[in-house]
Amino acid sequence: MEKKPFLTEAMAQEIIEDVPTPFHVYDEKGIRENVRRINKAFSWNKGFKEYFAVKALPNPVILQILKEEGCGVDCSSLTELMLSEACGFTGHEIMFSSNQTPVEDMQKAYELGAYINLDDATMVEFLERVAGVPQEIFCRYNPGGTFQLGESEEGFQVMDKPGDAKYGMTEQQMIDSYKKLMQKGAKQFGIHAFLASNTISDAYYPELAAILFRLAVRVQQATGAHISYINLSGGVGIPYRPEQTENDIMAIGEGVRKKFEEILVPAGMGDVAIFSEMGRFTTGPYGALVSTVIHEKHIYKEYIGLDACAANLMRPAMYGAYHHITVLGKENEPCDHKYDVVGGLCENNDKFAVDRMLPKIDIGDILYIHDTGAHGSAMGYNYNGKLHCAEVLLCEDGSHRLIRRAQTPRDYFATLDFLPFMKPLFED
């Protein structure tokens, strides 16, 4: 699909007058419209709810926007629970999916009345001991082996290997866990699974749904447990590369509906509510990292140096992930120069792009790095003493709003404020 910025050069310059680069910027209109498409795609299911994965974009203003559009939140830590509570999410508006869970995290989830999703069979006794067993509870499923989807000339295209993942229970462990939970007072049950990441295929969710729907029928028959909810989790991806095709959420929703009618309805389970956790799909395309070119270097390769670095967007350095780059104001110029676009970390993998064909770039140009609305700012870090950059909301009316200020040296040193010789750093 064609990669178009939601900011023009003039719009970016207007923001820069208030908020220096680098910063992440989010498109409120795009996010709201996308959530409405998701809700429409699954409107056939009366209990449907999107639980936005907080880890994808843990900004309270964004979470409040999503709440207004009917979303819940998917949390996996104490601080994500605290953030969600502060944004007004309570009870079953919260899904708590964690692994190797600390006591205080589990207790907070129980206190908030969140749906608790148990990652392991041993968590049944752990939950009862540290908090209590709620009447409604989920268990996470891991089918093992290799998840395969689609066919090519070479045969099945492998998408992921659940058998190598640390998450979830076997089917027999789930059956045993449901039986124990029923004995301890649980009355309604959910199933959750995540089998593949960032899939660019309308077939993924329907195929996952079929696996979980059949599992639900078997588990209910084996235990007598009332399966009330099935959480398809995340995995629906976005087209980071221009040559990739955008997922059609309406086709995905219809595919899941067909599996629902084919498998659950004949089993007398037509009242099951469907949940999702599409963090990346929900906000990913509606965020960008805006950065200024501050250096150029000409040695064995041509380098463009930015005021942003991997501390502001980790994915290219960590995964070798592709993020499209637009030089604002030069959208219609030929991409006839080959560059490595880099940041200033003392690590050679601090590269936003390698051998990327772009228009001729000059110092002072503004670069728009696409698709940072999920797992962008959220994965920021402080290595090399680099500071987290600001976050800005492009509002529906075209105005902009600071929704997270940039980190300062005082913030960076805050955990050292008890050391006497560090006090000069905190003096105004």
List the predicted regions and their residue ranges.
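Conserved, mostly hydrophobic/aromatic
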Residues: 31, 55, 77, 109, ...
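Conserved beta-strand positions
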Residues: 75, 96, 118, 193-196, ...
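Active-site loop/helix belt of alpha/beta enzymes
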Residues: 146-294, 358, 384
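Active-site-proximal loop/turn and secondary-structure-junction residues that shape catalytic pockets
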Residues: 56-58, 79, 100-102, 120-122, ...
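ATP-grasp fold ATP-binding core
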Residues: 136-142
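Generic secondary-structure signature for well-ordered alpha-helical cores
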Residues: 21, 36, 40-44, 132, ...
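A charged N-terminal "starter" segment
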Residues: 1-115, 121-135, 150, 181-187, ...
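Charged (often Lys/Glu-rich) extended helix/loop segments that serve as interaction or gating elements
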Residues: 261, 265, 269-428
